[in-house]
Design a protein with these regions (language model features):
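Basic, flexible Lys/Arg- and Gly-enriched helix-loop patches that mediate nucleic-acid binding at interfaces
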Residues: 1-128
Length: 128
């Protein structure tokens, strides 16, 4: 759920997706349970998933309600099901993930099913 970028521009796609460029992606994540500081510390160090240490993660708790915790998470890589695996490993099953940012591009006020074109300035920010 959340921000998806569609493009037919190969250079733009490469700049956004290739791990070498380390484009940050922001997510809101809801997990079951009250997340402890030790668990966040483990994520920030770079979680080990499938025998591979991943890059450090920026993460903070936004709020906790009824045994559910909402977090803000930033990754610079994005392997298959990485977020779910990270939280499963530290004991907090993921209930919802919503991407709100890819590099300089923000979801903003767009609602589900809505779209908009990138501005020339946004394209320039990605390519430079």
């Amino acid at each position: 759920e959340g921000l998806i970028l569609l493009t037919n521009d190969g250079d733009l796609a490469h700049q956004l997706m290739h791990p070498r460029h380390k484009v940050s992606k922001g997510y809101f994540v809801k997990v079951r349970g009250i997340v402890e500081n030790k668990a966040l510390s483990d994520l920030r160090k770079g979680p080990v998933i499938d025998d591979r240490r991943h890059q450090r993660v920026r993460v903070k708790i936004l709020h906790t309600v009824n045994d559910k915790t909402w977090l803000e998470l930033f990754l610079r890589e994005g392997t298959n099901r990485q977020i779910k695996k990270m939280f499963q490993k530290i004991g907090y099953p993921v209930q919802k993930i919503k991407r709100f940012q890819i590099g300089p591009i923000m979801l903003g006020d767009l609602q589900s099913g809505e779209s908009r074109a990138l501005s020339p300035k946004e394209i320039e920010q990605i390519l430079n």
